[in-house]
UniProtKB/Swiss-Prot annotation:
Species this chain originates from: Escherichia coli (strain K12)
Primary localisation category: periplasm
SMART domains: Ami_3
A Pfam match: AMIN
SUPFAM superfamilies to which the protein is assigned, alphabetical: Zn-dependent exopeptidases
Listed name of the protein: N-acetylmuramoyl-L-alanine amidase AmiC
GO process terms (BP): cell division; cell wall organization; FtsZ-dependent cytokinesis; peptidoglycan catabolic process
Length: 417
């Protein structure tokens, strides 16, 4: 009897040990599987971006299929979950590149994503390390296969940027302004730069107002005003919810031979007390204040947040910084002061003078460039104002008034090569 009990106890012990071993192996296997936490699709006329965010860096393979044209991405060590299943619903009917998408568990270790296309594309895939609240990201950008044949300067610059050819595509800096009356010899060319876009939302207010949205609205209003001026021509670095690298923004201004560059933003700080409008210009000798330095650092992080492929990293610290002319910075300060004076008539000023710091987006060596912080989106009252059509229109009108005042004070046009 006792021998029988001993045998039963031994069997139970072995069964328990086996169960514990299986549980342990199961937990190890589960821990080794990457967890996809978000999928985002950003369609735009220039390119469509698909972002897969996960708790671990993803291993992937990409290939193409024909009849119909498809891009296939296999992600290893991932299990299909509700986040991945929801990707198909994110494909918009007006996406220029993706017709539809489907996701499935291809084998026990692999999830397969299949994108049916509306046109031939050049896919580019790269990984982004965690930054600013984002986890590991796998990014797929879909560019049109005939990109070089299209008459879209921004698209061409994006292509050049991602191939590492941006430098030789940008016209060289000129020696200085050319004499002549602005708007009389030729139209004044103005490049508007709505900050952030796509993955990079910019600052977000208490009530979830996103900087990238309000600054695009302000830029569109300003564009409409400038288009009514007979002696001005206007371009925008982006007119969609799309990520544009900082150096591409600068390069587009140079390619369009802009006379002025205006980057539009909505300020934020760690506390909700600061308020008011500000204007910034470039400095090659350090920031004029701690706040200006902090702001430049946060704005310059846009490429890390928005997502720049490794092939473009060489341009982030380009020697363009060393080429900036002191004359251009002096003109930027004059231009900034003219705009700041006009902003002071419609909103409190955070600082009464134009501040300076090393903003990457202001580094065009031959174009007077300013960064306008329209208001503090982190301030609850100013967040409310930023959402209103009235305040947006007032800001747009103030910037245009500043542009006119700058040229009325004797500013000359940028030299044309």
């Amino acid at each position: 009897m006792s021998g029988s009990n001993t045998a039963i106890s031994r069997r139970r012990l072995l069964q328990g040990a086996g169960a514990m071993w299986l549980l342990s192996v199961s937990q190890v296997s589960l821990a080794a599987v990457s967890q996809v936490v978000a999928v985002r699709v950003w369609p735009a006329s220039s390119y469509t971006r698909v972002t897969v965010e996960s708790n671990r860096q993803l291993k992937y393979k990409q290939f193409a299929l024909s009849n119909p044209e498809r891009v296939v991405v296999d992600i290893e060590d991932v299990n299909l979950n509700s986040v991945l299943k929801g990707m198909a619903a994110q494909i918009r009917a007006d996406d220029p590149f993706i017709k539809s998408a489907r996701v499935g568990q291809f084998d026990p270790q692999t999830v397969r994503m299949v994108f049916e296309l509306k046109q031939n594309v050049k896919p580019q895939l790269f990984a982004l390390a965690p930054v600013a609240g984002f986890k590991e990201r796998l990014v797929m950008d879909l560019y049109p296969a005939n990109a070089q044949d299209m008459q879209d300067p921004l698209l061409a610059l994006l292509e050049d940027y991602n191939k590492g050819d941006l430098e030789k595509q940008v016209p060289p800096a000129q020696s200085g302004p050319q004499p002549g009356k602005a708007g009389r010899d030729r139209p004044i060319v103005i490049m508007l730069d709505p900050g952030h876009g796509g993955e990079d939302s910019g600052a977000v207010g208490k009530y979830k107002t996103r900087e990238k949205d309000v600054v695009l609205q302000i830029a569109r209003r300003l564009r409409s005003l400038i288009e009514k001026e007979g002696n001005m021509k206007v371009y925008m670095t982006r007119n969609e919810d799309i990520f544009i690298p900082l150096q591409v923004r600068v390069a587009k201004a140079q390619k369009q031979r802009a006379d002025l560059f205006v980057s539009i933003h909505a300020d934020a700080f760690t506390s909700r007390q600061p308020s008011g409008s500000s204007v910034f210009a470039l400095s090659t000798k350090g920031a004029t204040s701690t706040a200006a330095k902090y702001l430049a650092q946060t704005q310059n992080a846009s490429d890390l947040i928005g997502g720049v492929s490794k092939s473009g990293d060489r341009y982030v610290d380009h020697t363009m910084f060393d080429m900036v002319q002191s004359l251009t910075i002096a003109d930027s300060l004059k231009f900034g002061k003219a705009v700041l004076n006009k902003l002071g008539k419609i909103n409190k000023l955070h600082k009464n003078q134009v501040e300076q710091a090393g903003f990457a987006v202001l580094k065009a060596p031959d174009i007077p460039s300013i960064l306008v912080e329209t208001a503090f989106i982190s301030n609850v009252e100013e967040e409310r104002k930023l959402k209103t059509a009235t305040f947006q229109q007032e800001v747009a009108e103030s910037i245009l008034a500043g542009i006119k005042a700058y040229f009325a004070d004797g500013a000359t046009l940028a030299r044309r090569g």
